[in-house]
Design a protein with these regions (language model features):
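Short, hydrophobic/aromatic alpha-helical segments in well-folded domains
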Residues: 224-228, 242, 252
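Internal, well-ordered domain-core segments that constitute the primary functional module
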Residues: 233, 245, 249-252
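A short alpha/beta connector and helix-capping loop motif
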Residues: 176-179, 250-255
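Acidic/histidine-rich, metal-coordinating catalytic segments
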Residues: 165, 238-248
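Dynamic "connector" segments at or just before major functional cores
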Residues: 1-215, 219-234
Length: 255
């Protein structure tokens, strides 16, 4: 006995309603009006003044002229990736995974002019694609931005005090460069010892270096200080240095 298969086949349902149309991203710029007492306030409304400041400082043009990235991402431009990371740091996020909390926030997406942020894996691939020369280019970008901020704020410090110190970053696992060295909170564990420099007068971060867990030597300290001095604005003429006993060596004094 032959059965007609068409009688026992379930018909496919026809989609109802109009097809979904993708909405255009919001466009928020320096000329966008804002209010601090209106309704429907976003918790990240403070990003608008930050984005306005970066726009007036020429951050986009500076990124396009300074950074050389051979792998061009598709989700967003290089400037949009860097701006998203910078704004996330202003919000208080310390990990790229935290960007998922603001992936569809109208303020952040409006500043970036995108519909929504790409997933975390896209940000990680973008960061992994950056070559080592990009790190020096970012320092150049930071130096130019500091110079422009000082000129806009009319800050003219001819004499400054530079604070230099190391910190301990405990490692969990077998990361490259980890050493068992000075680690008072987690004795015996591997760690890194980054060097950080701050400007005492303005509390600005001037420069830093991610190092292994060994104690820095005299030549390393001198080379690091030379790079920090080069990042200072041109108006600085006299520099006073403050550091603990671990940095006291003849190479550092000569630098």
């Amino acid at each position: 006995m032959v059965k007609d298969s068409s009688k026992h086949t379930r018909r496919t349902s026809v989609p109802q309603g109009s097809p979904k149309v993708g909405s255009e991203p919001n466009k928020i710029a320096a000329k966008t009006p804002f209010d601090f007492s209106g309704k429907n306030l976003t918790p990240y409304g403070g990003l608008l003044p930050v984005a306005t400041m970066l726009e007036k400082l020429g951050f986009k043009q500076l990124v396009e002229e300074t950074l050389t990235v051979h792998r061009i991402p598709r989700a967003m431009s290089i400037y949009q990736f860097l701006l998203a990371i910078v704004l996330a740091i202003y919000v208080g996020f310390s990990r790229l995974n935290h960007l998922r909390f603001v992936a569809q926030d109208p303020m952040l997406t409006g500043v970036l002019q995108v519909g929504e942020l790409p997933p975390q894996s896209t940000f990680w691939r973008f960061a992994a694609s950056l070559a080592l020369p990009v790190a020096k280019q970012l320092l150049v970008l930071q130096r130019v931005l500091r110079q422009r901020v000082w000129e806009a704020a009319r800050v003219r410090l001819e004499t400054i005090t530079l604070d230099t110190d190391t910190t301990v970053h405990t490692l969990y696992g077998q990361q490259m460069g980890g050493r068992r060295s000075y680690n008072p909170k987690n004795k015996g564990k591997r760690s890194y010892q980054p060097i950080l420099n701050f400007l005492a007068e303005t509390h600005e971060y001037v420069g830093g270096e991610l190092r292994n867990g060994d104690r820095p030597r005299g030549r390393q300290i001198a080379r690091h200080l030379d790079n920090v001095f080069a990042a200072l604005p041109a108006c600085v003429g006299q520099i006073f240095a403050r550091a603990d006993a671990g940095f006291y060596c003849w190479e550092a004094i000569e630098a």
